[in-house]
């Protein structure tokens, strides 16, 4: 469908010229400042696609410093109707192993210093009971099954401020909250996407067990990078297969 345009947030590798046709770089400015990176625009499987690096092209922006409003505004202005956002997460559950994919359906906001809305001048209470796009989640699960990838069709992510990792006490507390995975980037990204009416779904890759699990080495940045590099090709294949399905799908459930 010609009105479908997919935004990809995160380091997915989909800006590879072999995958993205008619590729071009576009620098944009927004009323909220500059986004984290230029937009890489092109077509994947004949679907208009826009790739944005959340933490900058060289991963130089820490989670609190990401200009989430500029990022989402830039994708909305570019005409994106859907967003697939990749992220590394720590597992808070035994069953979610390093390397597993999780298509989260709920979040808990444990951030402290982030702007959570576009609405600075008027009071808007955005419905958030179902914050992620169930249609995208279904397509991702279908694609993961076809590719025989270990995945979990739903889960709750808790987003912390960072950039430090959790203490053991915090990790156990987050488990008691009902969170399944932990990261530093989903909030406020998902909230802002809902405010502008974009279908949004997180593609979370488990890289570690945070620090709650006895007998497991506490998470380090090096550990995260190692698992991500090892599974990058799986994420790329998943996104490619899912994008080919989205072009036949138009979701109205995420529109306000």
PLM segments and residue spans:
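Metabolite-binding pocket within alpha/beta catalytic cores that recognizes anionic/polar moieties
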Residues: 1-128
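Non-catalytic positions within long, well-ordered alpha-helices that form the structural scaffold/packing
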Residues: 76-79, 175, 194
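Short acidic/polar active-site loop segments enriched in Thr and Asp
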Residues: 81-82, 180, 199
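Active-site rim beta-loop-alpha module in soluble metabolic enzymes
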Residues: 131-176
């Amino acid at each position: 469908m010609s009105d479908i345009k997919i935004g990809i947030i995160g380091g997915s590798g989909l800006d590879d010229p072999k995958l993205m046709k008619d590729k071009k770089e576009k620098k944009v400015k927004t009323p909220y400042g500059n986004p984290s990176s230029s937009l890489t625009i092109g077509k994947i499987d004949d679907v208009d696609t826009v790739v944005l690096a959340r933490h900058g092209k060289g991963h130089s922006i820490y989670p609190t410093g990401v200009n989430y409003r500029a990022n989402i505004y830039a994708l909305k202005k570019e005409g994106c109707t859907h967003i697939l956002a990749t992220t590394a997460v720590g597992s808070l559950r035994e069953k979610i192993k390093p390397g597993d994919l999780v298509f989260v359906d709920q979040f808990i906001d444990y951030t402290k210093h982030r702007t959570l809305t576009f609405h600075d001048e008027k009071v808007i209470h955005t419905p958030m009971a179902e914050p992620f796009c169930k249609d995208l989640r279904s397509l991702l699960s279908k694609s993961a099954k076809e590719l025989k990838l270990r995945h979990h069709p739903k889960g709750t992510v808790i987003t912390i401020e960072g950039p430090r990792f959790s203490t053991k006490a915090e990790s156990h507390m987050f488990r008691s909250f009902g969170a399944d995975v932990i990261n530093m980037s989903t909030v406020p990204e998902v909230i802002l996407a809902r405010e502008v009416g974009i279908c949004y779904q997180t593609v979370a890759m488990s890289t570690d067990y945070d620090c709650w699990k006895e007998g497991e080495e506490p998470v380090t940045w090096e550990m995260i990078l190692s698992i991500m590099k090892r599974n990058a090709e799986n994420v790329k294949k998943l996104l490619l297969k899912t994008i080919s399905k989205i072009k036949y799908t138009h979701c109205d459930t995420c529109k306000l």
